[in-house]
């Protein structure tokens, strides 16, 4: 409880002071208000803690200080747990060493590299800089970083759920082990384990491990590239082979293209990928020999066609729908809903353009509003929107990792080679080129793609020229 209290005066002056105040009140009963308020100018405020009986706790009557509060204690039925510092990252055999001994361990490289690497991290936390550690131990800053990062990669292999074999882990105990594991730092735990096994099987050097890691990291981003489907994402050899396969496409000289494909053939693992590389290698060798190579054999035109869509790809601008003269309200189907949901999506039965009313044949929960583009407005009764969570599933290279809407016409399902279509594969709706469907013998699709809509983005160039066929 808080209260206002007067400072404790000397006992001898208490009676005199009280009499003086009483005399002053009788002689000046009509003193101005501001003068009366000055009587409280000498008061001070202090905090007094009262106990259950109403008496102050702590000091005596002359003590106006806050009483000492003892530290909290746990109730009898609870266990009090004081703060404990985090465990030391140092191995047990280094915990009892003083600073000089720790520096000696690093200076003389006493033990395996992943055993003394925690000493570098501990010194950094104690205020040592890489240059001061180098001056004291002779380990350069680059090597310090390599050893510390490689230790973290090695720890992730040890903690792998699949259990990285201990006999394989010893392969990296050599002096060059940190350089190999350092290159795997950008991969996730599963990819690191696969890449480490591949590096051991092929006895790769740091440069080869770097190429392998980059190919595994880059492979998912290349979805939609020509030949990508033939390679396996979870196979390190296929990822590396696809990287070299792609480099062969970028080579200007035919001999360089053949050399890259031969290198790809050395590391490819799965049969579909091997067949794709061999077919491309045969074409490249005939081209290098001066033979005329038709576009259908493997074709430069196929690569160019794969790089751009055959339908308009539009990136919306902020406020474009609100400013449009006419808009269309279309039902939306998720890619995971399958072909049955696409077929049963509502169709427009009546439109009142004057009042802006639309009548459909059934209820629906998801709708999209798009500008009234001419090709879509002409088939608005059969139009439907397919929502794709990842635009990279689209069959062209310029697709990006973003959500997209595919506007399709259900009234036109016959497959022709020049078209783009929506088909169902394993219960999911996907977009495929008519040329590929025709080669597979597919004569009818779920719908024909009219336009692909991309979300707005904060940049001036909303629609790039290479997005159009």
Curated annotation (Swiss-Prot):
The lineage of its organism: Eukaryota, Viridiplantae, Streptophyta, Embryophyta, Tracheophyta. Residues 1-78 are annotated as: Disordered. It is found in: Plastid, Chloroplast. GO terms for cellular component: chloroplast. Belongs to the RAF family. One of its GO terms (biological process) is ribulose bisphosphate carboxylase complex assembly. Residues 90-281 are annotated as: N-terminal alpha-helix. This is Rubisco accumulation factor 1, chloroplastic. Residues 246-294 form a coiled coil. Residues 311-456 are annotated as: C-terminal beta sheet. The keyword Plastid applies. Residues 20-41 have a biased composition (Basic residues). Required for assembly or stability of RuBisCO. Acts at a postchaperonin step to fold and/or assemble the large subunit (LS) into RuBisCO. Keywords: Chaperone, Chloroplast, Coiled coil, Plastid, Transit peptide. Has 3 domains, the N-terminal alpha-helical domain, an extended flexible linker and the C-terminal beta-sheet domain. The N-terminal alpha-helical domain stabilizes RbcL dimers and RbcL dimer-dimer interactions, facilitating RbcL(8) formation. The C-terminal beta-sheet domain probably dimerizes Raf1. The 2 C-terminal beta-sheet domains are swapped and pack against each other to form the dimer interface. Residues 1-46 form a transit peptide.
């Amino acid at each position: 409880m808080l209260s206002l209290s007067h400072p404790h005066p000397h006992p001898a002056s208490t009676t005199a002071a009280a009499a003086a105040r009483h005399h002053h009140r009788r002689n000046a009963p009509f003193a101005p208000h501001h003068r009366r308020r000055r009587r409280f100018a000498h008061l001070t405020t202090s905090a007094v803690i009262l106990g259950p009986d109403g008496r102050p706790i702590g000091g005596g009557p002359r003590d106006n200080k806050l009483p000492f509060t003892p530290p909290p204690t746990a109730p009898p039925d609870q266990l009090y747990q004081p703060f404990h510092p985090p465990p030391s990252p140092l191995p047990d055999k280094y915990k009892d060493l003083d600073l000089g001994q720790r520096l000696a361990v690093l200076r003389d490289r006493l033990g395996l590299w992943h055993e003394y690497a925690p000493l570098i991290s501990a010194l950094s936390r104690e205020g040592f800089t890489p240059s001061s550690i180098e001056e004291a131990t002779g380990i350069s800053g680059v090597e310090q970083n390599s050893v510390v990062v490689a230790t973290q990669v090695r720890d992730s292999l040890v903690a792998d759920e699949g259990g990285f074999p201990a006999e394989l882990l010893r392969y990296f105990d050599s002096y060059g082990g940190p350089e190999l594991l350092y290159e795997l730092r950008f991969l996730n735990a599963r990819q690191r384990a696969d890449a480490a096994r591949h590096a051991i099987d092929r006895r790769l050097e740091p440069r080869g491990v770097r190429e392998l890691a980059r190919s595994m990291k880059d492979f998912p981003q290349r979805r939609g590239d020509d030949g990508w489907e033939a390679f396996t994402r979870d196979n390190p050899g296929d990822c590396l082979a696809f990287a070299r396969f792609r480099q062969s496409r970028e080579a200007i000289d035919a001999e360089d293209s053949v050399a890259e494909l031969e290198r790809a053939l050395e590391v490819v693992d799965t049969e579909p990928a091997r067949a794709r590389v061999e077919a491309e290698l045969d074409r490249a060798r005939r081209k290098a020999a001066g033979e005329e190579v038709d576009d259908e054999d493997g074709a430069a035109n196929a690569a160019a066609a794969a790089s751009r869509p055959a339908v308009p790809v539009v990136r919306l601008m902020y406020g474009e729908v609100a400013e449009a003269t006419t808009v269309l309200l279309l039902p939306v189907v998720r890619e995971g809903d399958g072909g049955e949901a696409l077929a049963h999506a509502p169709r427009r039965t009546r439109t009142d353009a004057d009042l802006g009313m639309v009548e459909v044949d059934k209820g629906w929960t998801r709708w999209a509003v798009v500008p009234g583009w001419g090709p879509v407005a002409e088939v608005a009764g059969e139009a439907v929107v397919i929502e794709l969570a990842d635009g990279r599933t689209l069959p062209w290279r310029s697709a990006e990792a973003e959500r997209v809407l595919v506007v399709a016409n259900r009234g036109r399902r016959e497959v022709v080679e020049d078209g783009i279509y929506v088909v169902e594969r394993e219960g999911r709706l996907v977009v495929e080129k008519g040329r590929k469907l025709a080669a597979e013998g597919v004569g009818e699709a779920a719908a024909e793609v009219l336009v692909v809509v991309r979300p707005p983005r904060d940049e001036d160039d909303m629609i790039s020229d290479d997005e159009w066929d």
